Amino acid sequence: MARKTPIERYRNIGISAHIDAGKTTTTERILFYTGVNHKIGEVHDGAATMDWMEQEQERGITITSAATTTFWKGMAMQFPEHRFNIIDTPGHVDFTIEVERSMRVLDGAVMVYCAVGGVQPQSETVWRQANKYKVPRIAFVNKMDRQGANFFRAVEQVKTRLRGNPVPIVVPIGAEDGFSGVVDLLKMKAIIWDEASQGMKFEYGDIPADLVSVAEEWREKMVEAAAEVSDEMMDKYLGGETLTEEEIIAGLRERTLKCEIQPMLCGSAFKNKGVQRMLDAVIELLPSPTEVPAIKGETDGVEAERHASDDEPFSALAFKLMNDPYVGQLTFFRVYSGVVKSGDTVLNSVKGKKERIGRIVQMHANDRKEIEEVRAGDIAAAIGLKEVTTGETLCAVDAEIILERMEFPDPVIHVAVEPKTKADQEKMGVALNRLAKEDPSFRVRTDEESGQTIISGMGELHLEILVDRMKREFGVEANVGAPQVAYRETITKTVTDVEGKHVKQSGGKGQYGHAVITLEPSGEGKGYQFFDEIKGGVIPREFIPSVDKGIQNTLGNGILAGFPVVDVTVRLTFGSYHDVDSSQIAFELAGSLAFKEAMRRAGPCILEPMMAVEVETPEEYMGDVMGDLNRRRGMVQGMDDDGLGGKKIKAEVPLAEMFGYSTDLRSATQGRATYSMEFKHYSEAPKHVAEAVMAAKK
């Protein structure tokens, strides 16, 4: 089956924004203009197509990145048909993992900002993730029809807050109630959309007289940004020659692909204005799969790569798992190279297992179409893969490659869940395992002491939604305990020559293991490291991994309060063995004993997770908000005007003090302040806190 759309006309894009910037509405309009949706779904009716989980429609926030395929020929049908694979990503900080994993499989992104709120905290997180994966992006400033809308302020904030390099390619005509269209700076014409056709039709007109000088000023900046692409373009521009529209677009495109500039557009998705021009910009300025660097991976430990071509061996990345009530597990994957057909056997190179792809479906939000095959650049979902988890590679059986893995953060909050009835008990195990498979930032374990099931995640909302899904999708009723903080233990000083000896010799085959270690702090975030510094064979080679294993088995249970031990370096320096009685288990026990003793002597302490908290509040509540953060042991690190007459406060606060903060903040500011928080790092807990934590564990 030949390709319908050449790969050069593919655009794999993400639509990414802060909560309430109107991202889902923007995506809905895209689906409407590209002819997929006949009736526009409004978020505030709870009817948006991309938000298809029940909870999303109730809460009006997007939780899972739905992937949708659609086509666009341009506002004036001026392009050959292009194929857009759109991933709608959540804007809530508890779901940052979803943003991260969609950034990994995209080629370009549209950042949606609110013309009133501008660049908000979550926008910064998303921007950092886009930088990490070097994703070229354009920005769309939405809600131009709202009170207080200001396009140029948003442009300025992209520069100052995100350290981006924004280049507007349109400017708005009017704002708030008077917003009526945009001036296209490439054509130097006004674009006015027809309201009766919900913006399906438009006409070009002259630029309003009062906007001519503004439009000329911004056009000049845009042309200069395009000319900076090369010395010859710059010479032409400085020599006073006029650059053609094609040359300007080519210059802007090349610089956008290199992530040197971010073209900016504006509009009001709700009022059906501006989204159409933004779709044209996706074609003009964002890359096709062949214009981004070849995907890197490794084969047998050697670096390898795959180019976006149907002729290369098949390779794909599974970036999301979803459970579907009718067909079971859907595995969303992005094809980087080659072709795969339904019924083919592929290799999961991470696990070294072969699997058969049953059926392949392409999603339109929650609607699916079965297709025969997918090719390089496609995004689709497979039915029938059993073993695959998020972030793993699927590839041709005879051309093995492991694509770069995604990094998933460790959870910072735990709660205990208990099934309400015996019947719920078994179902809960199945449900939790399935949810954990879908979402790598969600973990499930059983507490050895209490026998309780503990679930961990990225925030209160994250866990709340998962418990909710357990009830809706799996029919499991559960009682949820109070949230617990994920404390850690570490050491503060170095100790040397600490020995652990495990000896049992009372006739017959005995046990003998003897290890001497140095224990030192390895620095924040460095994790556990083990170095073998044995000289002269005082411990035989085959027993050294056993010492390491014994220590690793002990790491999960610190000596102060049983929390996991992090950021320690162990050097195995000396020891002894017995020809007959030494065994692997004896050296595991020796390693464990040495480590426990060394921990006791090395100034053990408790670490607590610190959160980066950002509060936006009207000025009159600033004193109350700051006082409250101080009471929560927060350290205020800076204050800013938020550009709307309010203040933006940045602070670092221990997670333990942040439970229930949203309720307290709402009542202290009559619901007018908002906040976001994300995990920053672990830091040593003050003495009184550590003592309280240890007392609670006894």
Curated annotation (Swiss-Prot):
Domain of life: Bacteria
Subcellular location, record wording: Cytoplasm
Claim: Ribosomal protein is one of the keywords in the record: no
Annotated keywords: Cytoplasm, Elongation factor, GTP-binding, Nucleotide-binding, Protein biosynthesis
Keyword GTP-binding assigned: yes
Family: Belongs to the TRAFAC class translation factor GTPase superfamily. Classic translation factor GTPase family. EF-G/EF-2 subfamily.
Name assigned to this protein: Elongation factor G
Gene source species: Chromobacterium violaceum (strain ATCC 12472 / DSM 30191 / JCM 1249 / CCUG 213 / NBRC 12614 / NCIMB 9131 / NCTC 9757 / MK)
